[in-house]
């Protein structure tokens, strides 16, 4: 009888299943690596590359910039990202330091691929001058976004399906 509303409801429920698979898969199969990358300030070079799964991060540069008239200082590192040796983009994670409150805010950099996301966080510099890096590979996260898109389509289809006033037979 009310096919658009039924189909929209079915599509919305199927979308929730896709979102659930994406969330479970991305949390159960995440690959996480925390490491220090040696840095030589005199030559502005890193002593090594950062390896995680089939990804390689190669140091490019770093910068310190003042934002909001010096109220915030941003420490940023720039890396070229490679997957299986092929360049996939550049990541520029940073640490923001609020001068007045001395609070730090970590700003991640993400490269999204069809099957997984490369999530890069710069945590600052240790006493030896090495960069503290936290890198994660989140698989199946794109399923969450695809599921959300399906959910919105399902809601629109279900809402667009007109419901007729029911007649009571006597």
PLM regions and their residue ranges:
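Solvent-exposed, non-transmembrane regions of integral membrane proteins
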Residues: 1-170
């Amino acid at each position: 009888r009310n096919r658009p509303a039924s189909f929209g409801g079915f599509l919305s429920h199927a979308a929730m299943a896709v979102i659930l698979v994406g969330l479970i898969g991305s949390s159960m199969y995440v690959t996480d690596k925390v490491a220090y990358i040696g840095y030589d300030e005199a030559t502005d070079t890193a002593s090594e590359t950062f390896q995680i799964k089939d990804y390689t991060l190669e140091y490019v540069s770093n910068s310190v910039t003042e934002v909001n008239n010096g109220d915030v200082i941003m420490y940023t590192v720039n890396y070229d990202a490679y997957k299986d040796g092929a360049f996939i983009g550049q990541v520029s994670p940073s640490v923001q330091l609020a001068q007045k409150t001395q609070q730090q805010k970590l700003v991640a950099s993400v490269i999204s691929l069809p099957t997984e996301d490369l999530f890069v966080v710069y945590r600052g510099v240790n006493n030896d001058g090495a960069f503290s890096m936290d890198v994660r590979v989140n698989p199946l996260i794109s399923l969450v976004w695809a599921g959300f898109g399906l959910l919105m389509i399902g809601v629109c289809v279900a809402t667009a399906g007109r419901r007729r006033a029911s007649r009571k037979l006597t």
